[in-house]
Amino acid sequence: MIAGGPSAVIAELALSDALWRIVWLRDYNTRIVLLGTVLLGLAAGQLGVYLLLRRRVLIGDAISHATLPGVAIAFLWSVSLGQEKSLGLLLFGAAVSGALGGMVVLFLRHAAKIREDAALGIVLSVFFGAGVVMLSIAQQSGGNAAGLESFIYGKAAAMTSEDVWLCGAAAVLVFLITGLLGKELRILCFDTELARSQGWPVLLLDALLIGLVVVVTVVGLQAVGLILIIALLVTPASSARFWTHDLRLMLPLSAVLGAISCTAGTVASAMVEKLPSGAAIVLAACALFVVSFVFGIQRGVWWRLARMWELRRKQDEQHLLRAMVEHLEARAALPSLTGELKSSEPVELASLIQERNWPLHKVRRWVIRLSQKNLVILSGDGKLQLTPRGLLRAVEYVREHRLLERYLMERASAHASQADREADYLEHGLLPEHLAELSSALHENVPQLPPNPHPHDTEPPADSK
């Protein structure tokens, strides 16, 4: 028996039926809203990457707020002419007002030499303030002003087939322009001075980006509203950056994430009564951002911590192997590095720990990992021995370290102790080509194991003689 009685069963069945109606797109209005918002998400995600890389994110916010006075003025104009409220006229007014706001930003930044953040703040506050005043006047004008507030917060449920065609046209326009001008927009985003030096119209390209932002913003007024449209422009692009650094992959990934956000938000809004679609879409985009922030394979926190942990493990293992070679070298017990390599003589692990002042529990972990890799052998009496493979690896690490030390001491006039510390930081990221450059820079054929410029222990202890 299900807890809660018959009412709980009825509620559960109703919820299940509502979910399946959405999944199978049985309702015409659901199909319209879902298709329109998905097209909007694709366009916003694609365009948002260029805004993010161009550092023009806030200009989308300024333009979206600048559309409000255009909506109010278009409504007042239609009322003064004795006409009914027309969505096409309202969107046209929003487009003109948004474009004007974008041009004012460009004028203040280039002609008036005002900082971009100040120009954006001026346009956002002035235009939105004017829009609020005009919206109040429109609501008191006696005309049919009902529904104008939906342009602020969004109301996807009111979308029609004409709105879907509009979203589709906007998506096609965004993909067409960004595809045809992909090379120019990439250079504009990454190296503006290079684009300017090659004679490209940087200001015109900026204006084109602003124009696309106006188009996407105006189209998105119905779905998410002018306040939240900026989140749809920025959040999918920001999420995509956690997964890849390749712009060719980032663009489609951002578009797909935008579409997924719109799909999830629209479905949630359809299932939960009185849940605003705009807020639901933005929350879905934010949820994807959190997932990307944590698990993104390029910049996600989880993978960055994993890479840092792996690098730290590699550093510790290198330090232990290098310490063993230096310990054997100081006692003239290092095996011959020519011909067939043999295992090294055993090294007292306790003596090594005492020399380097390492914590015992950490050294035990290092030894276990190196033993699993067949680089060292730990005997029952606490002695550590390098295998032939481990000896070869350890000598490579010592050579890298000493090449760096010599380079820093000869070319940077660094003291031996300072060169040792700096080499500890740099050696773990060396590539074979870096080693070749170091050898060439020293103008001599460096032996396989260069001499130690500052041995930790130049003579064996008295009790070992």
Which residues fall in each region the model found?
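Transmembrane helix-bundle core of multi-pass membrane transporters
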Residues: 124-178
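Structured cytosolic domains appended to multi-pass membrane proteins
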Residues: 337-465
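Helix-loop-helix "hairpin" substructures at the membrane interface of multi-pass membrane proteins
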Residues: 160-231
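Structural signature of hydrophobic alpha-helical transmembrane segments
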Residues: 29-41, 87-99, 168, 218-231, ...
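Membrane-interfacial segments at transmembrane helix termini in multi-pass membrane proteins
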Residues: 281-326, 432-458
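Membrane-interfacial amphipathic/re-entrant helices at transmembrane-helix boundaries
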Residues: 1-41
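Short amphipathic alpha-helical interface segments
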Residues: 309-358
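Short loop segments and helix-boundary regions at transmembrane helix junctions
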Residues: 49-64, 68-142, 240-254, 268-277
